[in-house]
Curated annotation (Swiss-Prot):
It comes from Caenorhabditis elegans. InterPro entries: MeTrfase_RsmB-F_NOP2_cat (IPR049560), MeTrfase_RsmB-F_NOP2_dom (IPR001678), NSUN5_7_fdxn-like (IPR049561), NSUN5_RCM1_N (IPR048889), RCMT (IPR023267), SAM-dependent_MTases_sf (IPR029063). GO terms for cellular component: nucleolus. GO terms for biological process: negative regulation of cellular response to heat; negative regulation of locomotion involved in locomotory behavior; positive regulation of rRNA processing; rRNA base methylation. It catalyses: a cytidine in 26S rRNA + S-adenosyl-L-methionine = a 5-methylcytidine in 26S rRNA + S-adenosyl-L-homocysteine + H(+). This is 26S rRNA (cytosine-C(5))-methyltransferase nsun-5.
Length: 439
């Protein structure tokens, strides 16, 4: 049935997004499914309510749904079916096989959701939270790709195309001025070099030639912080440990003026292939992109001996990601999953800090959970080797007033980002520096 095809395509898009392979828009517009509008809407909506669905699926009577033969092991397809059942237009137009996945358990699904609602965690609560988020206007951040042109050339070209360049914002009135932006206005960001700001609701901005041809790279401001704070010198070597889709790799290469080398590793071969395409389109000439498991990588290998800088942006819950079209890919991740992520993140960071020539590493997540942020930093700093060789850099970007949680000693030395406070995705950054130079 046609609706089954839609549901299966949405499930694949959700899988890609949660695996950090593609953004929702890139996945939708790269799909062969013709009705892009329906595809985009259902993908965004299913992702938005995913935290509720995840909690429902934790119920002991409903866990078996994940093994239902009719969904072929796709929990992402379950998200779509549950969205249509609990929020959307129902399952009236899909096949009997897909309907049965929900219909055989519908009473228990509703019981669990109602119990969640009584505690303020159900569908209604999510809708109310979403109404609040709609009032937050996150602008479109675009990084000038200095591998293709200079910042001056970019600004002059924007002016010739009738954009109004309003200059550099001041940090103290950033939010006030950004929320008043008109669609033809452009600001220069006060924190991140070569980052400019457009109004949040510009239509078809992805099709603008500067964006399509990657003269401007659409990248959330918070996501620009890792490479910006790493600040690798031209001619140096960087290791991007979990690199796909390559945004931070391309940013590092731009800062390095395409001089030196960036080792860009990721576990998934298809993500590496996509990353290579994006890096090529961005004119990155110094990236060595390859598939591999960083935890199984011999960081003492001679070929990595000149690596002085590392970007550690490991898999995370994605709880900070708030996209346009009300697309929320994160949420209240269950504690068991957070604990597993925390352990993985700490292992990856500790392994990166064992690069023998390393001078500086930036750890980042697009998560709001302290388990993945301050707790990881705390745990890593307790490691004997790390404690003897590294310190957490203090006074990082002092003009950035939104810091880590005060309940942790490391908090004041870390950066946090939040849609309501910084007008960005939720994010966390910490900078580690070697106590003594390895040179």
């Amino acid at each position: 049935m046609a609706t089954d095809a839609l549901y299966n395509e949405v499930a694949e898009i959700i899988r890609c997004v949660l695996a950090k392979e593609k953004s929702v828009r890139n996945a939708v517009y790269g799909s062969s499914y013709k009705n892009k509008k329906a595809l985009l809407r259902l993908s965004c909506e299913s992702l938005k309510f995913r935290p509720v669905f995840d909690e429902i699926l934790q119920d002991k009577e409903l866990k078996s749904m994940k093994r239902d033969a009719n969904i072929g092991g796709s929990v992402e397809l379950l998200y779509v079916l549950m969205y249509e059942t609990l929020v959307g237009s129902g399952l009236t137009r899909c096949s009997q096989e897909l309907k049965s996945v929900i219909s055989r358990r519908i009473q228990r699904i509703k019981e669990v959701e109602h119990a969640m609602q009584d505690e303020g965690r159900g569908i209604k609560a999510m809708k109310e939270a979403d109404d609040g988020m709609k009032k937050i206007q996150i602008p479109r951040y675009a990084r000038i790709n200095t591998l293709k042109w200079t910042a001056d050339e970019a600004m002059k070209t924007l002016e010739t195309e009738k954009w109004k360049i309003l200059g550099t914002l001041k940090p103290e009135n950033f939010a006030e001025m950004v929320t008043k932006m008109k669609d033809d206005e452009v600001y220069v960001d006060p924190h991140v070099e070569n980052l400019i700001i457009f109004a949040p609701n510009i239509q078809n901005f992805y099709e603008y030639w500067m964006v399509e041809q990657r003269y401007l790279i659409l990248q959330d401001k918070a996501s620009c912080l890792p490479a910006f704070l790493l600040n690798p010198r031209p001619g140096s070597q960087v290791f991007d440990t979990c690199a796909a889709p390559g945004m931070k790799t391309s940013h590092a290469a731009a800062i390095m003026e395409n001089q030196g080398k960036v080792w860009a590793m990721d576990r998934a071969a298809d993500r590496v292939a996509t990353m290579k395409q994006l890096l090529d389109a961005s004119k990155v000439a110094i990236a060595s992109s390859f598939c591999g498991d960083f935890l199984k990588t011999d960081v003492t290998d001679k070929k990595f001996s000149k690596v002085k800088f590392a970007i550690v942006d490991p898999p995370c819950s994605g709880s900070g990601i708030v996209k346009r079209m009300d697309e929320i890919t994160g949420g209240n991740a269950e504690k068991e999953r957070l604990e597993k992520l925390k352990n993985l993140q700490a292992m990856i960071l500790k392994h990166a800090l064992k690069l023998p020539g390393l001078k500086r590493a930036v750890y980042s997540t697009c998560s709001v959970h302290e388990e993945e942020n301050e707790q990881v930093v705390d745990e890593v700093l307790l490691d004997t080797y790390v404690r003897q060789n590294y310190v957490l850099k203090k006074n990082v970007l002092p003009e950035w007033t939104y810091r880590g949680l005060k309940t942790y000693e490391v908090g004041e030395h870390c950066l946090r980002a939040n849609p309501k406070v910084t007008l960005t995705n939720g994010f966390f950054v910490a900078v580690f520096e070697r106590v003594k130079s390895s040179e």
